[in-house]
């Protein structure tokens, strides 16, 4: 298939409108956002501008230049203070502990409103700790890999007493491809899916896998809990499995090995 890259900030309302008017999109997959829990504490306005205003611009474009399906990235962080695990899409998600999480919850509410008002099929996908090649440099897999290979200390928050549902990028993409082809046919065509490995990993075990893969020992700097963080993320993927017969399956050992191989090649280590 043909591919074109067009650089545009989706807070640019006029530019985005012109793009939709000229291209006549069938499906829109929005993975653009100001991401990250900790950075949202330092730079809150960036999150409102990108994640709320930018998403509103996108919804308006889908309204005025109708599409068959809008799929957008939500986040596991919207589950906030929920202590019930694993997290299911039907669980309440009204207690965010970061502005980032609040903006992602806002996206879901805004999408529901546009699905109800204008019949736009929208699907929010709650990603759980995505990692792999081309991953964000501010996330633990990249930070830990870089530090361990360079012999620098790593910051281990909450003294390592955390669990994350690490999900390999290929599994995320496979799940997205299933979802994209199946917009909701409900009277209000709005839906939500979790995509996660459904196998949370202790942070210290995660570090051990990187150490074993890299053949080096981490220098650990134990830290307290960071504001905006949660102790555990854990996806219930029953809805994804029931609707599409799909479940992410890449083990943390296999995923880190693939990530390590890419990292070494990319950075010529």
Question: Which residues make up each language-model segment?
Answer:
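Hydrophobic alpha-helix immediately C-terminal to the catalytic Tyr-X-X-X-Lys motif of short-chain
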Residues: 106, 110, 114, 144, ...
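C-terminal substrate-binding subdomain of Rossmann-fold SDR/epimerase-dehydratase oxidoreductases
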Residues: 8-9, 148-269
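Short glycine-/acidic-enriched loop or helix-start segments at secondary-structure transitions
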Residues: 39-40, 81-83, 134, 166, ...
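N-terminal Rossmann-like NAD(P)+-binding domain of SDR-like oxidoreductases, especially those catalyzing
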Residues: 1-130, 246, 262, 266-269
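The catalytic Tyr-centered alpha-helix of NAD(P)H-dependent dehydrogenases
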Residues: 95-103, 127, 133, 137-141, ...
């Amino acid at each position: 298939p043909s591919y074109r890259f067009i650089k545009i900030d989706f807070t640019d309302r006029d530019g985005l409108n012109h793009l939709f008017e000229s291209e006549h999109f069938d499906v829109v997959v929005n993975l653009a956002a100001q991401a990250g829990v900790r950075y949202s504490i330092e730079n809150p306005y960036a999150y409102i501008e990108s994640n709320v205003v930018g998403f509103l611009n996108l919804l308006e474009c889908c309204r005025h230049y109708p599409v068959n399906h809008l799929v957008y990235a939500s986040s596991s962080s919207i589950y906030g203070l929920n202590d019930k695990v694993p997290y299911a899409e039907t669980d309440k998600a009204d207690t965010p502990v970061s502005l980032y999480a609040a903006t992602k919850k806002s996206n879901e509410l805004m999408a529901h409103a546009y699905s109800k008002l204008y019949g736009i099929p929208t699907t929010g996908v709650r990603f759980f700790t995505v990692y792999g090649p081309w991953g964000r440099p501010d996330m633990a897999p990249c930070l830990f890999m870089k530090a361990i290979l360079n012999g620098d200390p790593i910051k281990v928050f909450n003294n390592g007493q955390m669990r994350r549902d690490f999900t390999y990028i290929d599994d995320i993409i496979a799940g997205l491809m299933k979802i994209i082809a199946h917009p909701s046919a409900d009277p209000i065509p709005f839906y939500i899916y979790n995509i996660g490995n459904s196998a949370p990993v202790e942070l210290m075990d995660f570090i051990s896998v990187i150490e074993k893969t890299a053949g080096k020992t981490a220098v650990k700097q134990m830290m307290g809990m960071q504001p905006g963080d949660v102790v555990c993320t854990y996806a219930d993927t029953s809805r994804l499995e029931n609707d599409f017969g799909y479940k992410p399956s890449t083990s943390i050992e296999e995923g880190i090995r693939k990530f390590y191989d890419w990292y070494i090649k990319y950075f010529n280590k």
